[in-house]
Amino acid sequence: VTTATEYLLVVYVARERRQEPVSTGHVAAVVGRSPSATTEALTRLAERGLVEVEPYEGVRLTDDGETAAVEAYETFTTLSRFFREVLGLPEAGREALGAVDTVDTVVTERIAARLLPDADLPDPAHDPPGVLVDPPE
């Protein structure tokens, strides 16, 4: 199941790597959903004030969407590194994506502070996690 957060993360990373707007086709390919299902999901995010969808143009994050996406990205990257570097999980990115909505930010802040103190968050424009960039195989 693709969550609203996953859509926000994909739009955020794509936006950082390219110019806006981000095509809905790109978002659909990365999340592994049909274009129509992706358009529906993005429309729901627009109704919540998190994105703006322009038909035949693409999608942009609103200020509220940007705030939510940055917070989710920080949680995602912290969990991804924890799952990979501490737990040794081979699918750390996928595991982190599945957990990003369920793990409290206080937990991820403690993980970052105690277990990954020297960890710099990747810059989504230059070092995005593959799970948020590449279509599923």
What are the residue ranges of the model-derived segments?
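A short, conserved structural fragment
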Residues: A46-P55
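Short acidic, hydrophobic short linear motifs in intrinsically disordered regions
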Residues: R18-A28
